Design a protein with these regions (language model features):
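Subtilisin-like serine protease catalytic core
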Residues: 1-39, 58-62, 90-92, 130-132, ...
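Solvent-exposed, polar/charged alpha-helical surfaces in well-ordered, non-transmembrane soluble domains
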Residues: 2, 41, 45-48, 52, ...
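Short amphipathic alpha-helical surface micro-motifs
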Residues: 5-10, 45-46, 116-118, 127-129
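Active-site catalytic pocket residues across diverse enzymes, especially alpha/beta-hydrolases
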Residues: 7-8, 54, 112
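Amphipathic alpha-helical scaffolding segments
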Residues: 24, 45, 151-154
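Short acidic, glycine-rich surface-loop motifs adjacent to enzyme active sites
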Residues: 27-29, 47-75, 98-99
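Soluble non-cytosolic domains of exported or imported proteins
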Residues: 37-44, 74-78
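Substrate-binding/specificity loop regions of serine endopeptidase catalytic domains
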Residues: 68-177
Length: 177
């Protein structure tokens, strides 16, 4: 908020935001409650609220989304990406999305598999990491199997594809699918 609309009062005018006379609409998504799933529905509701409020006030709006996730297809076709594109075309709306600060953590992998081919994809999960989310994107008609192997060598899977939530434990780790 200070970078956007800081008025410089605490620094005797030396440090001010880019729009010190700007007005802010701040929307907090709330506590995720440890469920570990993407909260894109709440994000879309928040953006919708801001765009509608700006239209009501007849003001332009610049929305900064620092959401801290790597979900989605990353090719502009996922529901949240298409929603943000549409929102940016509404009224006088500008949307900025952070590009991440994961550095060299190898949070993404991509590739193609031929029928019958297997591939191991190592995941870097910290020892005390409380939650971890993984998305696998395939073409609609593809059928894949997923198995997990812990650092201790315990293996789970292939995991069956079923509708609804699946919960199970591997050692001390709870998996929520």
């Amino acid at each position: 908020a200070g970078v956007a609309a800081g008025n410089g009062r605490n620094s005797k005018g030396q440090y001010r935001g880019v729009a010190p006379d700007g007005e802010l609409i701040v929307v907090k998504l709330g506590n995720p409650g440890g469920i570990g799933f993407p909260r894109t529905a709440e994000l879309m509701q928040a953006v919708d609220y801001i765009v509608k409020k700006a239209e009501e006030l007849r003001m332009p709006v610049s929305i900064n989304i620092s959401f801290g996730n790597t979900y989605g297809s990353h090719n502009g076709t996922s529901l949240p990406e298409r929603f943000l594109d549409a929102a940016a075309e509404t009224g006088r709306t500008l949307i900025s999305v952070g590009t991440g600060n994961e550095g060299a953590e190898a949070g993404h992998a991509s590739g193609f598999l031929r029928e019958g081919e297997e591939r191991n994809i190592p995941l870097a999960v910290q020892e005390r990491q409380g939650a971890f989310s993984l998305q696998i994107w395939t073409d609609y008609t593809d059928v894949i199997g997923v198995a997990l192997q812990t650092p201790s060598g315990e293996r789970v899977g292939p995991i069956r594809e079923v509708m609804g939530t699946q919960r199970f434990r591997v050692g001390k780790t709870e998996l929520l699918l």
